[in-house]
Amino acid sequence: MLEATPLTEGWILRHEQGPLAAVVPGCVHTDLLAAGLIPDPFLGRNEAEVAWVGRREWTYEVDLPGVDAADGHDRTDLVFDGLDTAAEIRLDGRLLGSVRNMHRSYRFDITGMSGRLSVRFASAYAEAEAVRERLGDRPNAYPEPFQYIRKMACSFGWDWGPTLVTAGIWRPVRLERWSTARIARVRPLVTVDGTTGHVELLVDVERAAGETGLRLEARVGGVGAVAEVEGTSGVVRLEVPGVELWWPRGYGEQPLYQVELTLHSEGDVLDLWRRRVGFRSVELDRSADEHGTGFTLVVNGERLFARGVNWIPDDVFPSRITPGRYRARLTRAAEAGVDLVRIWGGGIYESEDFYDVCDELGLLVWQDFPFACAAYPEEQPLRGEVEAEARENVVRLMPHPSLVLWNGNNENLWGFRDWGWEERLAGESWGEGYYLGLLPRVVAESDPTRPYTAGSPWSGSWERHPNDPAHGTHHSWDVWNREDYAEYRANVPRFVAEFGWQAPPAYATLRRALPGEVLAPDSPGMLHHQKAEDGNGKLARGLARHFALPEADFDRWHYLTQVNQARAIAAGIEHWRSHWPVCAGTIVWQLNDCWPVTSWAAIDGDGREKPLYHELRRLYADRLLTLQVRDEGLVLAAVNQAGEAWDPAGVRLRRMSVQGVVVAEVTVSVSAAARTVAGVRVPHEVEPVEAKEFLVADGDGLRAVYFPVPDREVPYPQPEFDVEVGPGSVTVSARTLVRDLLLQADRLGTAARADTGLVTLLPGERVTIGVRGWEDVPGVEDVRRALYCVEPAR
């Protein structure tokens, strides 16, 4: 039987100042940080102080005693699941191999060898710049050479991330001892026909020597099957009756079946492969219709409006991301109503831990191939690396039922057409051959049960603009970059794969990241932790359209920018959800951060939720009431993504003044069948017509609020409310209109979390906000100082 021994102990890292203890899996930066040799690059402006690390060579070493004994096995292999990135591997001075791809695993036969194992990493900068020198400079979105090396692109910085180019053994390394043969690769093709599941295991084996007879045995769901190995391959087919379907979150359960495959020779078990699978079908409906070209995910025959978030690496040093951290982040996503996570193409092919959690939670996964915002050369050595990594990772991730879509790249097709690349490239390769040739071929050959799309955004044809909202996927970035979020209403894309609005992280996150700094939007540390081009300018212009800008009041600025972020995303999602099935999904940019930064994230780099996160819980709930401005006037839309019809017992519409007076009131009926949207025209008598008026819609425990003018024009009363504090709660009772009340619980204790975000209270209403994590129950005045709401323009 194959024996695997992890190599986690005894590693040292050699560098200019001598050896130091190393953690494997890990990376250079985290080892230097643990040794006290560099400051924390996440704090202050330390990022610049550690830039030298990416320009150096680094060597990891460990002794491998007794490898030559081999413990009676025919073979001993040294296996690396991930090396970041360009490295030479030597054992006892002998070169085992040279590698240059973070996204691949590597295996070396070291039978009969022992001694000092050395992994010497070249500077990723030096490697990338050498390739650029050889192949020629090509355009990208950031002035770094990230497209010339198969490494996580955002290591080189992004408009939300630091430039921290590291190196290291970033995924597990082990010794594998085996005899006769081992299971080298398994491609599980899992399909379902009614309630009958089909599992086809296409198996490759590696032989140590000879042509010994080999047999494969597989079991799943109480069903077994056997097949002989012919040469170095075999196929095992199983038919499993009465299977339960795996469904996305909110549509059904997520039953998982364990597949166990064993390799036998003359009665001995040589190797074991074990994975969990789920039985479900997935299609991507890209049919043409009167609105353009659709982009609708269909799972088990059910058409979905995808309630999505974009995912970036959760740490700029991915080796630090634990299984528990993956589970915490993804659980928070599921609790916010998310049912689809897009893994963005400037990061990595995500880990088994990530996908296991998605399988269990029913989170659909859209996996980008790692290409983003650049013209990628198709010449060697890069082309061979791209094909090898794609084939390996497609097969690695195939077992996971959560994986429903492969996407060729992020914004590169758009960049070629719109960002001046075509002229600059002048006929040089830029990645089109990957996205329209190599990658779809790899997916078709290896994973034919899943759809592939060439890129995001992509309209499906060069005959149309790549980012045409009427065809395929659309990235909506005119809003934020140039326009107000009210402009989301200008079109109805078929699928919105990116849109977003920035806000700073939680106050406690800022205080940890910028210790001792007098905080201001333009203070040195705040500017350093704002990576977007003209980011603060866009924040200011976005605020000015809606609010009177606070002067020299950082706390108000912090609150209002977070409110504006939540409102912007709400404007988009409510509009687009109300247009289902023409629009079939929204993927918010972005769920998470990789460090403390002002960004588009809903959960900041320290794991604290912004108000946007709590707003997503409302926006992505199965049922949503929304008031929408249409050509014919104001419309009340009932969005019902639940599996049962929704017939609220009358929706109460109140036209109110900001002083709390009900000017007019009616009750309307609206009924939405399962998975549909229904709308009703708001009667004229309850439409607000003055700046001092607004409309409230209440039905079935849900509320929608509509103000006809920006906040800066609304004559709000001075907010008045009473506060009660309990052991784990804060209750606020409104005496006036209180708009967008927010408890910033982290101001009361760095571990404190509130379970509620922005709440609008009418006079006489109250809300109880649950709080966990504070050490001592604070006083009422302390809580008042942590409560914020919209105030009259000053």
Residue ranges and their predicted role:
Residues 81-84, 122, 278-280, 309-312, ...:
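Short, solvent-exposed turn/loop segments enriched in Gly/Ser/Thr/Pro and often Arg
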Residues 15, 168, 406, 441-444, ...:
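Substrate-binding clefts and catalytic carboxylate motifs of secreted carbohydrate-active enzymes
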Residues 376-464, 567, 607:
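Active-site neighborhood of glycoside hydrolase catalytic domains
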Residues 56-63, 329, 333-336, 354, ...:
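Alpha-helical packing segments of well-folded alpha/beta enzyme cores
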Residues 133-140, 357-364, 378-391, 421-429, ...:
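Aromatic- and acidic-residue-enriched segments that line the glycan-binding/catalytic groove
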